[in-house]
């Protein structure tokens, strides 16, 4: 597993963020995690806009993306990522509390790497997060644009 891949966790709910961190550790994922509390923070980091920190060009990233966030929702974040030449290959795992077929279809249409429903129980959620591991193994980042 690529432990140098940084996991970006876009999750506004403190409880869900804590459970996600714990569940990842439980399934053996020990990568650095950077958390964003809303979609705008996530976009600012990825695109280098705003006042805060931004992504580093030579770092591998994997985004765990909640759909229901303030300021900018997860689907808008995913759409923005897929429209950006330097971001579009970044693996994005959607974490959602719903298994709504329309939302799943929308996310798959925007080429999310995986759609994980946040299971009601902790053990089931931890098991579901096993799906994240392959994306750490085969990270497509950092991104190259053909320029040196």
Please name every model-derived segment:
Residues 5-15, 20-25, 63:
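Conserved acidic segment of CheY-like receiver
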Residues 21, 35-62:
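Acidic, metal-coordinating helix/loop segments flanking the phosphotransfer/catalytic sites
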Residues 41, 120-131, 139-147:
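C-terminal output helix
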Residues 67-69:
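Receiver (REC) domain active-site loop signature in two-component systems and cognate sites
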Residues 71-72, 81:
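Hydrophobic residue at a beta-alpha junction
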Residues 113:
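Short, glycine/charged-rich "phosphate-handling" switch motifs in NTP-dependent
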């Amino acid at each position: 597993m690529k432990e140098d891949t940084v996991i970006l966790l876009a999750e506004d709910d403190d409880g869900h963020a804590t459970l996600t961190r714990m569940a990842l550790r439980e399934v053996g994922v020990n990568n650095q995690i950077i958390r964003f509390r809303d979609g705008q923070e996530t976009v600012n980091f990825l695109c280098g806009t705003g006042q805060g920190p931004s992504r580093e060009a030579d770092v591998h990233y994997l985004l765990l993306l909640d759909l229901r966030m303030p300021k900018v929702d997860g689907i808008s974040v995913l759409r923005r990522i897929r429209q950006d030449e330097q971001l579009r290959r970044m693996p994005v795992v959607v974490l959602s509390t719903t298994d709504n077929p329309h939302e799943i279809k929308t996310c798959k249409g925007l080429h999310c790497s995986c759609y994980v429903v946040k299971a009601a129980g902790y053990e089931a959620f931890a098991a579901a997060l096993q799906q994240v591991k392959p994306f750490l193994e085969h990270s497509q980042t950092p991104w190259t644009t053909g320029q040196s």
